[in-house]
Amino acid sequence: MLKVLLVHDEPIIAQGISVLIDWEKYGYEIVDTANNGLEALEFLKHNSVDLILADVKMPVMDGIKLLKTIREEKLSDAFFVIVSGYGDFTYAQQAIKYKCTDYILKPVQKQQLLDLAVQVKNLYSTREEQKTEKEEMSRAYFVRYIQALLLGRPDKEALEYVSGKMKFSQN
C-alpha cells in the first residue's frame, strides 16, 4: 500500500478527498491529515509517505512553502500534488519548480483523483524499477572490481570504486 498524507486547513475538504474514491482499492492508505504545512513537516520528520496532497493556501505554512521545504531539506521523495482553488499560473509555476507531480484545481472531481491514483502508482513502479536496476548495476560493478583485485589485476578505477564502497577498519 502506498501511504498518503493529506494537508488541508479545511477538514470538510480533506474528508471529502479521503472518501471521494476508494483509496484502498487502488493500493493507497491515507495515513494522516495535517491542517497546515508545519504539521505536515512534523509528521514527515518521523514518518515516510509516498504521496502528499496539499492545499496551496493554508495558515502557518502554505502548500508551496511545504513543497519547497521538503525538496530543499530532502525530507521526503514522495510524489507531491497541489490541490488548489487558484488557477493562477504563478502558483503552478512555483509548484513545477519544486518537482510537483500534479496540480489539481478545486472542486476536485472523482475522475481526477482516480486518474491521479493510477498516474502516481505508475510513477512509483517506474521509480522502484529504476532503483532496483541501479542497485543491480552497482553490485555488478563491485563484483567485477573485487574480482580484478583478487586476481591481482588492480587498476586505479577498481581501487577507488571498491574503497568507496567498503569501510576499512584502521586498527
Feature roles, as predicted:
Residues 8, 55:
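Active-site residues of response regulator receiver
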Residues 65, 76, 87-102:
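Alpha4 helix (beta4-alpha4-beta5 surface) of REC/receiver domains from two-component response regulators
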Residues 52, 80, 95, 103-104:
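Two-component signal transduction core modules
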Residues 96, 102, 108-171:
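Interdomain helical linkers/hinges and coiled-coil/dimerization scaffolds
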Residues 33-42, 63-65:
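Helix N-cap/capping motif at the beta->alpha junctions
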Residues 11-32, 46:
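Two-component/phosphorelay signaling modules centered on CheY-like receiver
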Residues 58:
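Receiver (REC) domain active-site loop signature in two-component systems and cognate sites
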